[in-house]
């Protein structure tokens, strides 16, 4: 029985799934919008939201050791300091007054080859 099982397996073993989600999250932060299957978009969305929340906390904290710890926590997903800098200093400040809901999933139809449902996962623009 699958009671209380949160994660979708996406027909992959654990390390493959972890790599897939980290790569999708990286793509979202680099280009701010990706086209992928709906199932993958729904699977990566919580990871992206959690990372943005950590980046917001890193910006708002006064303790330098806490800021370093949060930056390292974000870095463990990507292992790319430039990307962490972009997330913490460019993306997170956009959502300073927003409590969650930093992304949206727009369904765009079906893939021609295998009829998989495709979606756009994008970061929301800054509120005016």
Swiss-Prot record:
This is Large ribosomal subunit protein bL17. Gene3D superfamilies: Ribosomal protein L17. One of its GO terms (biological process) is translation. PROSITE patterns: RIBOSOMAL_L17. One of its GO terms (molecular function) is structural constituent of ribosome. GO terms for cellular component: cytosolic large ribosomal subunit. Pfam families: Ribosomal_L17 (PF01196). It comes from Petrotoga mobilis (strain DSM 10674 / SJ95). Part of the 50S ribosomal subunit. Contacts protein L32. The keyword Cytoplasm does not apply. HAMAP family: Ribosomal_bL17. InterPro entries: Ribosomal_bL17 (IPR000456), Ribosomal_bL17_CS (IPR047859), Ribosomal_bL17_sf (IPR036373). Belongs to the bacterial ribosomal protein bL17 family. Keywords: Ribonucleoprotein, Ribosomal protein.
């Amino acid at each position: 029985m699958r009671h209380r099982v949160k994660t979708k397996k996406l027909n992959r073993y654990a390390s493959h799934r972890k790599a897939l989600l980290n790569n999708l999250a990286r793509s979202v932060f680099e280009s701010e919008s990706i086209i992928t299957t709906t199932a993958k978009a729904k699977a990566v969305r919580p990871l992206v939201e959690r990372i943005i929340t950590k980046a917001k906390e890193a910006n708002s904290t006064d303790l330098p050791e806490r800021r370093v710890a949060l930056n390292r926590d974000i870095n463990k997903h990507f292992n790319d300091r430039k990307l962490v800098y972009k997330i913490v200093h460019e993306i997170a400040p956009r959502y300073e007054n927003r409590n969650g809901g930093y992304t949206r999933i727009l369904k765009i139809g079906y893939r021609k080859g295998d009829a998989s449902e495709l979606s756009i996962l994008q970061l929301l623009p800054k509120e005016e």
